[in-house]
Amino acid sequence: MKRLQAYKFELMPSGEQCRAMRQYAGCCRVVYNKALAWQNAQYQADNTFKFSYTKIANLLPQWKDELNWLKDAPSQALQQSLKNLESSFRNFFAKRADFPKFKKKGLSDSFRFPEGFKLEQYNNRIFLPKLGWLRYRNSQAMLGTPKNITVSLKCGKWYASIQTEREVEQPIHPSSSIVGVDVGIARFATLSNGQVFEAVNSFKQKQTRLARYQRALSRQVKFSNNWKKQKGKITKLHSTIANIRKDYLHKTTTTISQNHAMIVIEDLQISNMSKSAKGTIERKGRNVKAKSGLNRSILDQGWFEFRRQLEYKQAWAGGSVIAVNPRNTSRTCPCCKHIAKENRLTQAKFDCVVCGYSDNADLVGAINILAAGHAVLACGVTVQQDRAVKHEPAEETTREYA
């Protein structure tokens, strides 16, 4: 089987190369925004008009004549920015993402080369079109044939992400166990075998410092040197928060994936669960402050990324991930199967009102998720996407985040 894998390395460019890379990233951003504006204008004139990469790519020479400095950027990188827009529209129509937005300077500055690059791992250097040879920190051995290179700027440092492809044998998972996983706010992940992974809450840890930095930024003169310095501090802190979260997720998913051949999770619609409860001017929302805190905790813990990592790591290890309907998983008694809201009146405790069974609520949820996974394997029960809602006791949530 073919395996695609990405490796990320820090680049060590010269000052001239840094200026050129900023220019190339800016050119790609301009082309992306012009293409999106053109597409929107065409759709306004004719609402049956569909996005076509070929049509927009044919406009690229005309844009280069209008803006001569676009000719300084590599043609491949400009074409790949149009490919990115094509992918954005494809994800939008597949309901995987929002409608494409215009790119802002300083956010996600990057460009990609699908060919024309060279890599010398033994010499710790990369050749990129129009940039020449660049040194990089060879922090890990790279396997496979390089397919493309994406150069990106983050926190003032340039990175090269190299996607590789290689043939591997169909893996066989060393374990034979199956486990249910329940994700939550108080506990990040609870397994049906009783193992618990506590929440790291990286944003909550740094929230006070972030607020202090943002208040200091508001007192600076915009675009002054002090403003830029303070802006850099905020960007670096956001990067630290993201790195703490990413590190914890990788360690957690690796541990679970290595020890269990089959993992059963809830098919949660994270985007729907983390929507704002403010409502509209005519119809105000309820428990807005509590819902805001819940949304912040869900996004802080990275439930979607947790599932994504589990799925690809299980595929690489020869295991599998089953997503089941989360409806009533935290309200069903695993002993007598009685379903009632009264079974779980608090965040932590589950007490069945019929048979008296009592246990930790998250553990009960994980046991029920495992049972639902067995039902899928035995009977082929399908997941109901439109009913994928996780039930949490409103009283406890309100008290915790009000």
Question: What are the roles of these predicted feature ranges?
Answer:
Residues Q42-F51, D98-L107, T382, D386-V389:
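Short alpha-helical "patches" and their helix-cap loops
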Residues F49-K50, T54, Q76-Q79, K83, ...:
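An alpha-helix initiation/capping motif
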Residues T54-K157, G279, R296:
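Acidic carboxylate diad motif detector
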Residues M1-L78:
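Gly/serine-rich nucleotide phosphate-binding loop at the start of the catalytic core
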Residues Q5, R19, K130, N138, ...:
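Positively charged, helix-rich recognition surfaces that bind polyanionic ligands
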Residues L36-Y43, F89, F93-P100, R166, ...:
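Long, hydrophobic, amphipathic alpha-helical segments used as structural scaffolds
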